[in-house]
């Protein structure tokens, strides 16, 4: 106790008093002052200032100014957010050497006190003493220029110290198998669990901030510095607290590095076991970590500022690493997990806090028992921790602190939940200042309601799962310590082997194997060869299991790599290692001596045998290493071949895809070409069809035009024929049957009776003898070509006017309506007998008769304008002519009908064959069917003009003078289109019977009608043979 008091005085003497305004103080300083006065430190800055002013006024001081002691022991505050830590560290970074010296003195006193407490901790205290010396040297070195290098060396030295501490702990565990060791092992197991939470938790709490060895080293150095700074920060609280904090902080250092060493030496099988036990333990395991958190929270609340000051002063590089990690942390997650790198809140936060809780539990045990052993301290520590279950999810640590603060002083309060199952129940860990307060809180608060939830409050002491884990961790730590003892002796050989790291992970695995082999071999030294071989097989199994674990969990892989990298870093040789090397060599020498004594006791082996055994072990190790390298090489070769095959396969697949793509493109081009050709064919086909349709339409149009033209020509012919027929004289063929026909003809030859159509002057019977029907005055205006020898033009001069007037008058009633149309008895199909034999003689007779008539004077007939008009009333009207009596004419008509009853049918059929309109053709049938006897004058030239200049004289057949005149009954011909031909006048009915020659021989009694285009050749308006008399001769 005296030593502790001296330490407090020394640390207080090292502080510097400084007067400041309260308003200028930082929140952390305000909380520190409030905590010194045992006041509430919750609230914002204004609340804290008002509370502090009130306290100072009560003390009688100046409420505006305060005397602030800036030293290592000043801050006794609750941990603040990361930003506050950064600012605080920056401000305190200037006083590194002064406070470091004070801290070293404190640590020396505390180490001496701790050494008095436990006789078995001598070696540990000496190590801590050396560590403090190293820290002193380190703090001076960090002020020099080579900060990074010394940071690495510091971390290496710390790793070695940790191994030595583990050895000492294992010795303690072997020596004492009491509850103290169990508790330490339990703490160790908890640390391992925390490391597992960080390294292998499913929610990725192991961040990438520590893959690099340098970063990890900085974090480790930072963590170690924090742990060492914890020792001197509780001076204002109590001296006993200071002592216990020093020891427990160092224990925490040892325990924290135990997990790393487990990973380094390949014995992470223990981690797997504890990890496997964690899910089974369930909520108990969760309960342990909150307990640890609460303990650690308490310690950090008391001593955080001292830690930060020395850390910042110690190493700017460490400060940067710590600050970056502080930014990642949220709220009041503690700094001692910075060696694990910045991690997200959640499971990593629990892991961080759990390591602090383990230290805090030790602190509280030392508080209760003072200078008693850590055995009694461990049992006492659990009495200060309260486990609160059944909290609602919105409960905060401040709520717990306020609630439990009613029944005592609350050192720390934590609210924890199971990060692996979000949404699970919340639990609370509250650390009270004494066990009496714990029992008071339990008595008052158990089964009460908080935030609508019923909470249960109980001590953390009797946790069954904790005991199980203590046992497991006890076993693990004992086996680990024995392995680590041996591992230190062969450390140099391992580092040499690790220099050949071709691929980092493979070489590290082989180094793990080497370390296991080393442990096994040195185990042989202690025991016998059988034991060694058993240990070897056990270590091989462990290494395989470790490989499995590392391959399954990427978090474990990261930690294995980085810990091995830190552990086996061959290039680290610095002052710190040299400083520490002497103490390590001494320890190794003492251990070797102990082993030699044990060997001598068991079996005194000659030196040669020992050398052979060592050589064998080395050979075995090298053989294993060679096998491992060979296996790795084979794996690499296999992997290379697999990659090559995969590459070739990918290349082939790509080539095949490209080939298929090219083929598809080619086929697509072909398809497009075929499509274009098909479309071109379709287009040509459509064009062809269109052209054919156009041709067909054109042909149809031409045919329609031709038909129209033909119809128009036919209509024109019909019109002309009708016009000409209206101009023609009335046909009086029936007068051929008149008894006076032959007698009067010659008498009236010179008259104009054939133009008069029944004029008053008398007509001779033979007036047709010299008359050519083709030259008849049908066209008196233009008859230019005439074959008669006398001047016929003179005869037409007086009559032309009257004849011109006829057609207009006669057109009043169409000619085809004038006569009944009889189509019933068509007899045109009978070919008439040929009449060629009569032609020559008839021609002579006609010429002779014409000559006889040349001197006949043609009289005018002014009184007759339309001689045929009276006939329109009936089919056979009486004629107005006076040269023959009406009675004789009608008598002749009747006789003619009797003699030739079939003529009208023939005539109709003959006309219809010629294609004229049937009405026109049959219009003359009212004359007793005598139309067939009428000759039709037609143009031989085939033209449609029916005027004399186009007419040619048709050779008249000579008429038979000896035959009766009445039998010559060829009707006067008309133009080719005038099928409704009219009978000529009485005087020329017989003489006008001329026939027209066609290309073929026409029947005797018909005049062939040759129309221009429409009349078929050889189908003239044929004359039908007489039935009642001899054939008619022309």
Curated annotation (Swiss-Prot):
Main location: nucleus
GO molecular function, one term: sequence-specific DNA binding
Acidic residues: bias regions: 91-101, 156-195
Modified residues (N6-acetyllysine): 401, 1024
Gene that encodes the chain: SLTM
Cross-referenced PANTHER family: SAFB-LIKE TRANSCRIPTION MODULATOR, SCAFFOLD ATTACHMENT FACTOR B-RELATED
Modified residues (Omega-N-methylarginine): 1017
Organism: Homo sapiens
Positions of crosslink type Glycyl lysine isopeptide (Lys-Gly) (interchain with G-Cter in SUMO2): 500, 884, 1024, 1027
Keywords, comma-separated and alphabetical: Acetylation, Apoptosis, Coiled coil, Isopeptide bond, Methylation, Nucleus, Phosphoprotein, Repressor, RNA-binding, Transcription, Transcription regulation, Ubl conjugation
Biased composition (Basic and acidic residues): 102-127, 135-155, 220-237, 270-283, 290-339, 354-370, 458-529, 539-548, 563-599, 718-757, 769-779, 790-872, 891-909, 947-969
InterPro entries: Nucleotide-bd_a/b_plait_sf, RBD_domain_sf, RRM_dom, SAF_Modulators, SAP_dom, SAP_dom_sf
Name of the protein in question: SAFB-like transcription modulator
């Amino acid at each position: 106790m005296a030593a502790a008091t001296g330490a407090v005085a020394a640390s207080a003497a090292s502080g510097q008093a400084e007067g400041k305004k309260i308003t200028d103080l930082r929140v952390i300083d305000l909380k520190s002052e409030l905590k010194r006065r045992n006041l509430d430190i919750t609230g914002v800055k204004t609340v804290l200032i008002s509370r502090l002013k009130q306290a100072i006024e009560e003390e009688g001081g100046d409420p505006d100014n305060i005397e602030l002691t800036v030293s290592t022991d000043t801050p006794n505050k609750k941990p603040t957010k990361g930003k506050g830590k950064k600012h605080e560290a920056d401000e305190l970074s200037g006083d590194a050497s002064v406070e470091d010296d004070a801290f070293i003195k404190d640590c020396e006193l505390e180490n001496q006190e701790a050494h008095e407490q436990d006789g078995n901790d001598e070696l540990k205290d000496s190590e801590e003493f050396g560590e403090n010396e190293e820290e002193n040297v380190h703090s001076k070195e960090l002020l020099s220029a080579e900060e990074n290098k010394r940071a690495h060396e510091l971390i290496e030295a710390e790793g070695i110290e940790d191994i030595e501490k583990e050895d000492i702990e294992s010795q303690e565990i072997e020596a004492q198998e009491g509850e103290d060791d169990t508790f330490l092992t339990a703490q160790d197991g908890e640390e391992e669990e925390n490391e597992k939470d960080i390294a292998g938790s499913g929610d990725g709490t192991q961040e990438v901030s520590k893959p690099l060895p340098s970063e990890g080293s900085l974090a480790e150095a930072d963590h170690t510095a924090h742990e060492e700074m914890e020792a001197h920060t509780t001076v204002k609280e109590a001296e006993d607290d200071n002592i216990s904090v020093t020891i427990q902080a160092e224990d925490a250092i040892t325990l924290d590095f135990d997990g790393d060493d487990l990973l380094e030496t390949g014995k992470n099988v223990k981690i797997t076991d504890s990890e496997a036990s964690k899910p089974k333990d369930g909520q108990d395991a969760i309960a342990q970590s909150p307990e640890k958190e609460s303990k650690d929270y308490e310690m950090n609340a008391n001593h955080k500022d001292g830690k930060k000051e020395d850390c910042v002063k110690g190493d700017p590089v460490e400060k940067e690493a710590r600050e970056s990690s502080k930014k990642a942390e949220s709220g009041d997650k503690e700094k001692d997990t910075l060696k694990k790198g910045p991690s997200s809140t959640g499971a990593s936060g629990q892991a961080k806090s759990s390591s602090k809780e383990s230290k805090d539990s030790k602190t509280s045990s030392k508080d209760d028992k003072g200078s008693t052993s850590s055995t009694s301290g461990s049992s006492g520590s659990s009495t200060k921790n309260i486990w609160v279950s059944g909290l609602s999810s919105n409960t905060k640590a401040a709520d717990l602190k306020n609630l439990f603060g009613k029944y005592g002083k609350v050192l720390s309060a934590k609210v924890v939940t199971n990060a692996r199952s979000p949404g699970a129940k919340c639990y609370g860990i509250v650390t009270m200042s004494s066990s009496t307060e714990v029992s008071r809180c339990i008595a008052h608060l158990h089964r009460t309601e908080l935030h609508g939830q019923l909470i249960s409050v109980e001590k953390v002491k009797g946790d069954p799962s904790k005991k199980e884990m203590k046992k497991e961790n006890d076993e693990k730590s004992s086996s680990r310590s024995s392995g680590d003892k041996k591992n230190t002796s062969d450390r140099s050989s391992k580092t040499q082997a690790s220099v050949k790291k071709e691929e980092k992970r493979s070489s590290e695995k082989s180094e793990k194997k080497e370390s296991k082999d080393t442990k096994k071999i040195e185990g042989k030294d202690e025991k016998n060869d059988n034991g060694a071989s058993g240990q070897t097989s056990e270590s091989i199994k462990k290494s395989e299991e470790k490989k499995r674990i590392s391959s399954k969990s990427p978090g474990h892989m990261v930690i294995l790599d980085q810990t091995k990298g830190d552990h086996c870093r061959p290039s680290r040789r610095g002052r710190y290692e040299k400083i520490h090397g002497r103490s390590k060599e001494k320890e190794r020498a003492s251990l070797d001596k102990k082993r030699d004594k044990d060997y001598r006791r068991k079996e005194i082996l000659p030196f040669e045998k020992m050398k052979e055994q060592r050589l064998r072990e080395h050979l075995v190790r090298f053989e294993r290493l060679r096998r491992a390298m060979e296996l790795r090489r084979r794996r690499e070769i296999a992997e290379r071949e697999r990659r090559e095959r995969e590459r070739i396969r990918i290349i082939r697949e790509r080539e095949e895809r490209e080939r298929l793509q090219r083929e598809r493109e080619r086929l697509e081009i072909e398809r497009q070409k075929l499509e274009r050709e098909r479309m071109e064919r379709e287009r040509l086909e459509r064009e062809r069809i269109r052209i054919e349709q156009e041709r067909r339409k054109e042909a149809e149009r031409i045919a329609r035009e031709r038909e129209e033209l033909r119809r128009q020509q036919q209509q024109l012919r019909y019109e002309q024929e009708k016009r000409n027929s209206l101009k023609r004289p009335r046909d009086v063929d029936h007068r051929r049957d008149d008894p006076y026909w032959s007698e009067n003809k010659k008498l009236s030859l010179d008259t104009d009776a054939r133009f008069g159509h029944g004029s008053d002057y008398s007509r001779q019977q033979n007036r047709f003898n010299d008359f050519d029907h083709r030259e008849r005055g049908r066209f008196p205006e233009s008859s230019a070509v005439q074959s008669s020898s006398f001047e016929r033009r003179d005869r037409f001069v007086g009559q032309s006017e009257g004849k011109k007037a006829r057609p207009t008058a006669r057109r009043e009633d169409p000619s085809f309506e004038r006569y009944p149309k009889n189509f019933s008895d068509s007899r045109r199909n009978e070919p008439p007998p040929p009449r060629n034999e009569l032609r020559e003689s008839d021609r002579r007779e006609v010429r002779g008769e014409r000559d006889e008539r040349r001197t006949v004077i043609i009289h005018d007939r002014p009184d007759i304008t339309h001689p045929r008009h009276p006939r329109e009333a009936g089919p056979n009207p009486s004629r107005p002519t006076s040269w023959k009596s009406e009675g004789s004419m009608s008598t002749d008509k009747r006789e003619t009908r009797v003699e030739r009853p079939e003529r009208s049918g023939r005539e109709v059929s003959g006309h219809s064959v010629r294609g004229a309109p049937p009405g026109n053709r049959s219009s003359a049938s009212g004359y007793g069917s005598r139309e067939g006897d009428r000759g039709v004058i037609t143009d031989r030239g085939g033209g449609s003009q029916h005027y004399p200049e186009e007419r040619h004289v048709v050779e008249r057949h000579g008429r038979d003078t000896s035959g009766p005149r009445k039998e010559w009954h060829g009707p006067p011909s008309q133009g080719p289109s005038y099928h409704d031909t009219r009978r000529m006048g009485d005087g020329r009915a017989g003489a006008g019977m001329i026939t027209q020659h066609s290309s073929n021989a026409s029947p005797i009694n018909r005049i062939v009608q040759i129309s221009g285009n429409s009349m078929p050749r050889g189908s003239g308006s044929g004359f039908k043979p007489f039935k009642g008399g001899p054939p008619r001769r022309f």
